[in-house]
């Protein structure tokens, strides 16, 4: 039974019954078993139910997803509602469900050519529309392509197309090497089947081989001799009854119209820039429709070639043709033919019918594909919509995977937006990933991480050979340098320069480069963090108060903390990461983002305070404002007597001033020189420098807004796609360079980046190596384990939460994560930094997210009107490694870096903080608080969770975030990592406040809870006794013995049951269509 195909018992509703030869080679399909949760067409017979029946329905719906049909059940159970599947859907499931190892069908380019008169004389095939995803029409008067738009079809044209496919010639998997050979094959087949009279063969062949005029070809100039030859040949063929024998006619045909036909593409085709929109393996589908005066009935053919073939100038672009649809009909129905051509072209651009067209084995398969399309089509009332209005392509296309899975036997399919994103949960979801499975062996997780990442080590270097990597290096380098200088300066203040800017540069370079070279996730960027800075300040003050050697005490804390981290690595403790749900991730990442935004504005306010603006200045009273440099005593000092001023330090004095002033006046000195030589500034305008603050804010806001605008420039309508992509990739570097140039041109003395120019420790009281013994009592070495425990929690939480955010499913990383390997290298680097008295480093959330954003990849070729699809992230080790190497070399680049204004870098900080909040569900829910109900976006969780529950969840998240912010700003900030760990406990407590249904859309379901839920369901099944003992212990879905209910989806009248005495609707439909078709 397992090796044979199961025949469809509902096949009596089909006109065509599959025989044994037809089903041979198909895999086994159990009709009614493993039915997905929902289909689009589901009819229910409603009636009033009693209390007992309601309970029964509730019990059935509770286990609905685990049940399946059994065919030999009693009819007493027929009231149980099951998904209804039409015969067309059954046939499509049979087609698409085949286990085929062949590659996926290629992208199709569909072109619609119509037979039209050129200059009112000669008939030619003229391109009028084309499709990849959306329709583009040739504008009648403008000689240009229209904007891509959604193809709107008349329902009547689809019915006409269906009848055409029923009556016309269907030729599948034919061999042809040229267009004349293909045309001759089609015409001969029509004659053999009695659809075409033999005496019309030459006329049809001549018509099908007419020249093709494409939109790219602006003119089709030919000599008068050629025109005359063509016209005379046509007149002889169509008007002279004694045209000779068929052989002579064929020779005339060949000489007159086939000489210009070539199998090779023309120059215009090769130069067509539209090829950039198509993938390399694309194939063509040509649709030829037109009206002629020598046919009494339509000439219809649908051809699929065994191998795609280049057919010369048949197609606008030089791609091989796989499909050909021909419709020639009598005069007077040109519009109808045009609409049928648009219908088949639109069907070929539909992803489901596209696959069916490639896999169809006969006519009935193609008709079933049309029926499926009709089942899914949406009809608009004629009085409420103007078909002439072109519908803009949507920003995000609905995935066709659900439709395909529904027919290919996919499970757990939910239609109409019922499925939560990312694997059924509301968030990124990482509970089931292989990297977080506990092995139970010593260093088992670490070994698996190494084995997982080792095969990709070589590709991690050559995958970086792209211009995008250069942009990412420059962007992250500037962010890292700014971060190193900022934290280095704060560490110097907190530790009395025992750790300063130079130590920050060196530590960042060494730790970051080693981590990016050997860690499990090289996209993660290491940096100093706020909690580490707080700990360093408290530790220094504690050592100073108790007369401990600070660096030695810090060394032992680092060693103990590294030892504890290695224990966590050896015991696979990283599996606890699966309890970091979206609630914890978003709380942590949002807090860090807000810190970046807050610090950027805080530094600008501090700058404005240092260079204040004179708010009392008035233009009309500018004579009352002055600032004069006065000497230290009231006696003026003669220039000749002043021997302390160097010649280059003297102010510039004009000859007239020298003439009138025999002695030198201190008023000519600059502010800096006045203070340098002991003078004092006197006046009510001293200290006010309005230009610096104003210019700094221009640079700050200009850098931020320009970066945001250029990052979105990729989707703008300006410039070609390549230029837009290049500008978007360098969206951060370009504003930095532009505003550095503006700052230099304006000449205002804004504060600049200060980089150490000498390679030596910041403090003369320390060296580059810390001795482990001799500075503190022996018991301090053991007591250091207590603060080390706190540092371990800090390192583990910071590192792993950032790793979870980096490895989210929505980033589509293909090379896997390495949580254990990452923590291992963080521990090793902590030992190195402790011995060298360098700052400790851990994963930086915001910079890591910025690193990923700068390396995102999108489809290079996208159909007109289609938004580029996100493919993933360029996973490699080169960008991070070079960033940290450049950071170490920054000491030698001080002469160049000193020209970068600090406000520009603060603008980069603001951009990173805001950009990392994009796409965070927490921010979307915050915006909902300010939106009226009618203006709220159509988020998936708003469809399934009451709004008050959404606001309650948001309120709890805001409350936790506020508490973390307050804690961070106080002396108790040292327990900050413990409070982040408390977020997991808060999220666990939400299970008692929210249902699992609500949490599955608003957050991730905690794995343990999910397992418990499944166990409870199994216990319920055992108690009810509805499952055999064999099924209780198996993993197979629970099934009830109920009959399959199969009602055709294309019926015109809904009936509860179908009897054999009445003809099926599929048999009646051709009669109905014959009265309403042009075919």
Curated annotation (Swiss-Prot):
GO CC terms, sorted: basolateral plasma membrane; plasma membrane
Modified residues (Phosphotyrosine): 30
Record-listed Phosphothreonine modification sites: 49, 249, 254
Single GO molecular function: monoatomic anion transmembrane transporter activity
Region annotated Disordered, chain positions: 40-78, 238-265, 1012-1079
Region (Required for interaction with AHCYL1): 1-62
Topological region Cytoplasmic: 1-466, 521, 572-585, 711-725, 808-819, 856-877, 919-960, 987-1079
Bias (Basic residues): 40-52
Polar residues compositional bias, start-end: 251-260
Catalytic activity reported: 2 hydrogencarbonate(out) + Na(+)(out) = 2 hydrogencarbonate(in) + Na(+)(in); 3 hydrogencarbonate(out) + Na(+)(out) = 3 hydrogencarbonate(in) + Na(+)(in)
Subunit structure: Homodimer. Interacts with CA2/carbonic anhydrase 2 and CA4/carbonic anhydrase 4 which may regulate transporter activity. Interacts with AHCYL1 (via PEST domain when phosphorylated); the interaction increases SLC4A4 activity. Interacts with AHCYL2.
Function per UniProt: Electrogenic sodium/bicarbonate cotransporter with a Na(+):HCO3(-) stoichiometry varying from 1:2 to 1:3. May regulate bicarbonate influx/efflux at the basolateral membrane of cells and regulate intracellular pH.
Name of the protein: Electrogenic sodium bicarbonate cotransporter 1
Source species: Bos taurus (Bovine)
Gene: SLC4A4
